[in-house]
Amino acid sequence: MGFDYFYGQQSQQFAFYRIPRVLFTDNRFRKISTDGKVLYGLLLDRVFLSQENGWVDEEGRVYIIFTLAAIRKAMDCSEKSAIKYLTELEEFGLIERIRQGLGKPSLIYVKNFIDQENLRVMKL
């Protein structure tokens, strides 16, 4: 397969997922798997969409809905792996899942790893 080079402004034509660099460079996040970090980037992308769509709770917190099926498709992984990555992020404190019951998908709150008061990465 022969791929071509990027020329001029062609490199700006694609949409990208953002994964915070600090998840890879700060020792406090070293125990999060690479796939968990990638999932966090996907969840962050959804936060921006949810905010645009007005998915905000009564406390002003943005939430997302990202089903296991959607995670499996986005990450090309099994259900067991998708659950593992979500659980890893939840146990680390980077997300909070609120189960709605009655077959509805969970609400996911993606937490900000920056301590706004001190403008530094929070200690987890």
Predicted stretch roles:
Residues 4, 32, 97-99, 123:
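Compositionally biased, low-complexity repeat tracts
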Residues 16, 35, 92, 107, ...:
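Low-complexity, intrinsically disordered short peptide segments enriched in small/polar/basic residues
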Residues 1-69, 73:
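Short recognition helix of helix-turn-helix/winged-helix DNA-binding domains
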Residues 2, 114-124:
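Charged low-complexity intrinsically disordered patches
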Residues 46-110:
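Winged helix-turn-helix DNA-binding recognition segment
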